[in-house]
């Protein structure tokens, strides 16, 4: 399990052709390539949260099935540092490294040589997070900070896989709450695919850490949940009718604690339990209003965490027509392990593609996009990419990035038609797409920025701020996107089935079933220049009749 972090390539070359030649080798924008490994072996995942550092030690058998050998945890409050002051103190960095080092020693005692150290909300939001990574590196440890979009995607996929056996219909129409002490992820699932995802700074201990108990953190949490209007956004994205019932899926350590108070113990990641609605409602009411009192001896921090978790669940439980509440046993460590196993067993396969497309379509509807046009462009860009892929190098997940850019390239028209490409870039830069890394997100936004007539220039901050690898990716994606957009000028149908491609020599023949090609030829002449510069191919439009 490789924990190395690839250093970003920096630098810029203004000339498009030179930039493409310099970076002609295969590009990889994933979290990191995995070493080839063969089970059985022991491995571990160390998770640095806002309040606790946890380690799970697993053994993978020859069939890649995981058995948990040991779990360790130590309380360590990073949230008070980050959410109150914005950084992690030097003293706490040293303590954290020592604690993680002890966990690594424990993994090695089992004979494990592959392990992964990940950090979530608190370290992710610290302005000195790069210093934390550097200090870990100096100690011989490699720390990976999970971006919010990565964390939610891994957890969602792992929960979906775990529920597929025991609660198969739970994620047909559902709202999933991934609760941590530092952050809250809200996911909307419609017809079995994710269509909404939002990270909220509403973790169960966040207001306690930021304000202190004297500032009534529970009331602050209630106000924030109401002000976010997340229920309305969920309804819009899910196209949910007013009284259509949903499953409420609660995930995370606070959720498992609430389930345990109902007598439901979740020992394994694959476990899940359906909670009795009346009993669970009474439990969260007691936690919410009595701060955990009456449940025996309980640590004040744990009581505060349970109260906040109850407030969060109550907000969604009262606002949605919940037919059931389900709590799976999945953890961040289990989700990270499952993702790594999948990458090793099925490299290049992305099970999240359908969900990302659904999220993009929901965002497009929010900004009144032309769904037929977006689908046409997505279909055409995919055909062009597949035709070019054997002959040119592309970033990992190019098909995924092209699909996202195709669906969202015109959302800026919601603001202004004339400069919609710039507004599309701005809107995308302020939207977080699950399943994409920060680098991939920048690539998609910049490709959308240049889907119109203007070419990328170093004078454009949105282009000059990219790394050299990212610039090449943007050029290739934008070049394909412009051609696909031009081809849709006269397509009357919501699919690009009439488009056929033929690559002969240095000419890419675009064959369409249209009698009048004049409008399409003009559009292609205006927008096809970048494609010819980037790929060195002439575009030739012809009638297929």
How would you describe each model-predicted region?
Residues 489-494, 534-537:
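Short secondary-structure junctions
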Residues 43, 57, 77, 81-105, ...:
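Helical "lid/coupling" subdomains associated with nucleotide-phosphate turnover
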Residues 517-538:
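Short, non-transmembrane amphipathic alpha-helical segments
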Residues 50-52, 159, 179-187, 253:
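Ser/Thr-glycine-rich phosphate-binding loops at phosphate-binding pockets of nucleotides
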Residues 2-44, 48-53, 58-120, 133-144:
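N-terminal glycine/serine-rich phosphate-binding loop of ATP-dependent small-molecule kinases
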Residues 323, 535-545:
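A short amphipathic beta-strand at an alpha->beta junction
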Residues 117, 145, 327, 541-543:
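A structural preference for short, hydrophobic beta-strand core positions in alpha/beta folds
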